[in-house]
Amino acid sequence: MAADGQCSLPASWRPVTLTHVEYPAGDLSGHLLAYLSLGPVFVIVGFVTLIIFKRELHTISFLGGLALNEGVNWLIKNVIQEPRPCGGPHTAVGTKYGMPSSHSQFMWFFSVYSFLFLYLRMHQTNNARFLDLLWRHVLSLGLLAAAFLVSYSRVYLLYHTWSQVLYGGIAGGLMAVAWFIFTQEVLTPLFPRIAAWPISEFFLIRDTSLIPNVLWFEYTVTRAEARNRQRKLGTKLQ
């Protein structure tokens, strides 16, 4: 809180552009799309939460791929140097260049990689039931819809042109395929060794790459352990 007599303003103020999205005043569609365009921020928050509570190497690798994807986007933008549409009506943006769209590239990387993970990484389970397959299909459609809506929001809100979000989506999809192959062929064989490092054991970092359906595995193990402890507690009370 500023004290009396300390309200002299600096020469200029700069906003935090990470979550700063502008939309036309009174435009309900633009208001909704402005929130949807924050999809990458929500994804990052989700990843940080998963890593803190799960500490799984594949999740950490996935986040590393997203970070690399952002670095590639920054490099391409500064090489091509194509301006944003309409003379750049938004002043609070991270960079004045718009080719390719970082939001589009981020979301399509996330969606394509998740799609590959669901259908290739989790295909090993032999007891896939109808509901399991339905869950994968619905989740995949949701991921693709989210990527499209975020890309569309950047065009609607005049942050990018259609070509900028299109090439961003292509770049993100290609990066996702490349990183998925690299993770499966190079990193995954190293995960057991990395998980055995003393520092990994100290931070409880684990490798679940050999478990085809982690969700089902955690459910069954937790249920079995809970029943076992309940029986022991019942025996003590008798």
UniProtKB/Swiss-Prot annotation:
Compartments where located: Endoplasmic reticulum membrane
GO CC terms, sorted: endoplasmic reticulum membrane
First-level EC class: hydrolase
Family: Belongs to the dolichyldiphosphatase family.
General function of this protein: Required for efficient N-glycosylation. Necessary for maintaining optimal levels of dolichol-linked oligosaccharides. Hydrolyzes dolichyl pyrophosphate at a very high rate and dolichyl monophosphate at a much lower rate. Does not act on phosphatidate.
Record's protein name: Dolichyldiphosphatase 1
Catalytic activity: a di-trans,poly-cis-dolichyl diphosphate + H2O = a di-trans,poly-cis-dolichyl phosphate + phosphate + H(+)
Keyword annotations of the record: Endoplasmic reticulum, Hydrolase, Membrane, Transmembrane, Transmembrane helix
Organism: Plecturocebus moloch (Dusky titi monkey)
Pathway per the UniProt entry: Protein modification; protein glycosylation
Example GO biological process: lipid biosynthetic process
Signal peptide: none
InterPro entries: Dolichyldiphosphatase_PAP2, P_Acid_Pase_2/haloperoxi_sf, P_Acid_Pase_2/haloperoxidase
One Pfam family from the record: PAP2
GO MF annotation terms: dolichyldiphosphatase activity
Originating gene: DOLPP1
Residues passing through the membrane, by range: 33-53, 100-120, 130-150, 162-182
EC code(s) of this entry: 3.6.1.43
Membrane topology, as annotated: Multi-pass membrane protein
Superkingdom of the organism of origin: Eukaryota
SMART domains: acidPPc
